Amino acid sequence: MSKQSERLFEAISHLNDEMIDPALEPRKKRKKGRWAALAACFCLVVGVVTGRIPLLGGRSSQPVSGADGAITFQSYAGPVLPMTLREENKNITAQRAITLDFAPWVPVWDEELELGRYDDHILVTDAYTLTNHGETDQDITLLYPFVTSLHSLELPVLTVDGSEVETDLYLGSYAGAFEGGGGLLEGEEGGSINLDATESWENYRDLLSDGSYLARALGTAPDVSGISVTVYQFTDPYAPEDRGETSNPTIRAAFDLDYNKTRVLTYGFHACRYDPESGAMVQGFSIPEERESNYGEPFYLLVIGEDIKNLTVGGYIAGGVDEDTPQLEGCGVTVERYESDLDTMLREVLTRMTNGRETQVDFELYYRVVLEQLLAYGGLTAQEKSRYSSGWLEDVASDAEGIQRVCWLETQVTVPAGGSLTVTVSMEKEASYDYSCDRANQGTRGYDLVTTLGSNLTCTEQTATLEDRGQIEILWQNFGFDLDAGIKTVELEAETEHYFLTVRRADS
């Protein structure tokens, strides 16, 4: 290994120490029995949602509860989170009034289907009357957090005294963990082949309580322009015109490397065999036809650290990387080797990856979340997850778009001396739910909120209002709503960190 390569790898290690915030460390996993592990094989995203306080008229049977007594849902949508200030200001206090509106549950007649349809999300209005107790005007920067993925990103709308304001978007990192593929017995260590989404509001408490997760989101993006990359670009692959019975001719690149000194990332490859003990790796891709979207696109092997050795390229009659697959005569590809850097090549790859496709956020934000996922869990860290062992950048980018994260909208307001203004946040809130459950618990949906988590804004009063629209039956809650008695607005206590509401349709 050359001194230059050693310096590169030292730089990579140093870079990750600085970039990877403790908040990115996967949360500690609870041990699962065999049945739970087997269930994880079929469902990559597992979740838990909130609470249990049955009201009069509620069901006697209840879904499985977590360790804290929370009702366990397989998909947890995350809580409604409170507004905070970029910099704490003792002159500013707030009165918070949150409304949970079940208007989307009202059936709407579909003429084409000849039936009523409805959604199971709700509308949330989270209003803050900000009061300035100081003797001078206060210019403050507001941050409003919300839980989402880029795939399902719908930005909340912020208004100040009724007028919509412009906002800037900040994205947090992956909020979940990783888990094995299943089949583990109690006490066995799991793997990291699957994503394991946040399971409860406590996961968000652990994520947000010390402020480091937010600080990372507000900070500057990692700079990897100083990481040198040796690029192997594969272009113009071809197969014989007469393929015979060969339906999937494939190009394979086989090479040797020292896994302790070299990292390989790829774009366009979709078959891989790696063997750290023997120091060998094989990467492959199907030769595209003209009708396919990747026809004419380059394929990349990106080598970081010490260069690979003994590269051989050949054509094979089928996909995969089985050693006994026969070779196919008449195949070929142009391979060009050149030097670049990780920033340039990642931008090149992501530009090609998103060509003609919307990414929900601008390119710089998209680039950043993919890079942070790669640096935290991909091949550039000693804590690499087996999910990314192939080095395929498509996997990292796909996860970066699909994983759940906390995001923030930022805006600036001026609260006059001795005066007040009202900031209102309006958004849709998805339900927490089960993919499958017994008949008695079918149709159960959960919604929850937290009062102070991650916020430095002093709320002198918090209230919650339920607009049930006559559509729901309350099963479990700790708000204190009573539909029969007409109690639909309640005062929340700051000492109660977490409030939850579990319902189903009134006519179910």
Q: Residue locations for each model-derived region?
A:
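Generic detector of low-complexity/intrinsically disordered segments
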Residues: 17, 26, 46, 57-58
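Lumenal/extracellular ectodomains and adaptor appendage modules
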Residues: 52-508
